[in-house]
């Protein structure tokens, strides 16, 4: 396998799935929180869903269980990750047409229709190139469509410390450099792509190596200090829309969601 990102994630399906199983660790809390916040930000969307780096499919599955999406295209560059997502979604989702595509997101082209919601979670650290990625995602949006984008933020001191201490080791282990972004980087990339930030959610205390030192204590701190993390957290999840939609009410119902409600 020539792509280093695909090769790295081929080893991780079981580890990745385990992060979404509730346990007393900071990592479990982090992934459960990411799932919850993504579902909140997607609350006004319905119709056609694209997850452009689905991993093992837990967040995709949670969104599809809402019953608001008639079709989902599930993309991942790793065959093992995509197979795991296929097994999960095929077993648990019965009212949505599912399509599974192994592809690099930059090379992915939809077969025809555009999307009402695009998920981009856990991706940009591994691929960077926001100046190319965001316009590509925007080009696949239906009218009223939105993007949910997640990143770890270098505005957070703990993130900067982890970057300084692990960058060389991560490069040797993965075979590629992790990309890091600040809030300003995200805002500038969105502006360049003609996207506006409709809403933002912050989470994660981001205590460096917290789970290595004491997972239970890290979990307790994450649980008890969620309010602080919602303002200053290490992770940012953004709801994006083309600039013409940016000034809409944050929870405005998308055209696809309006059509869905009309049929109920």
Q: Which role does the model predict for each range below?
A:
Residues 1-43, 148-170, 221-222:
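Conserved class I S-adenosyl-L-methionine
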Residues 56-107:
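Class I SAM-dependent methyltransferase SAM/SAH-binding core
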Residues 119:
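A conserved beta-strand element that flanks and buttresses the S-adenosyl-L-methionine
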Residues 122-123:
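Short catalytic micro-motifs in class I SAM-dependent methyltransferases
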Residues 131-143:
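A short glycine-rich, Lys/Arg-flanked "PGG" loop and its adjoining helix->strand segment in the class I
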Residues 162-170, 188, 199-264:
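A C-terminal cap/extension of S-adenosyl-L-methionine-dependent methyltransferases
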Residues 168-185:
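Acceptor-substrate binding/catalytic loop of class I
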């Amino acid at each position: 396998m020539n792509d280093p990102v695909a090769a790295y994630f081929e080893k991780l399906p079981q580890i990745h799935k385990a992060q979404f199983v509730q346990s007393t660790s900071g990592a479990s809390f982090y992934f459960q929180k990411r799932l919850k916040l993504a579902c909140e930000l997607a609350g006004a969307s319905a119709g056609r869903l694209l997850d452009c780096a689905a991993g093992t499919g837990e967040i995709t599955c949670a969104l599809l269980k809402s019953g608001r999406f008639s079709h989902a295209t599930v993309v991942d560059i790793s065959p093992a990750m995509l197979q795991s997502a296929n097994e999960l979604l095929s077993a648990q989702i019965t009212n949505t047409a599912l399509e599974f595509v192994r592809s690099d997101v930059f090379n992915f082209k939809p077969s025809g229709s555009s999307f009402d919601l695009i998920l981009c979670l856990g991706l940009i650290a591994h691929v960077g190139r926001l100046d190319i990625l965001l316009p590509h995602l925007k080009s696949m949006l239906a009218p009223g469509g939105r993007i949910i984008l997640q990143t770890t933020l270098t505005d957070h001191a703990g993130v900067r410390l982890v970057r300084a201490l692990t960058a060389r080791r991560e490069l040797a282990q993965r075979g590629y450099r992790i990309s890091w972004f600040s809030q300003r980087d995200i805002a500038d990339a969105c502006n360049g792509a003609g996207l506006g930030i409709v809403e933002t959610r912050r989470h994660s205390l981001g205590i460096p190596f917290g789970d290595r030192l004491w997972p239970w204590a890290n979990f307790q701190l994450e649980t008890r200090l969620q309010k602080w993390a919602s303002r200053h957290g290490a992770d940012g999840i953004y709801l994006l829309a083309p600039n013409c939609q940016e000034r809409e009410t944050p929870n405005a119902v998308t055209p696809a969601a309006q059509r869905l409600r009309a049929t109920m």
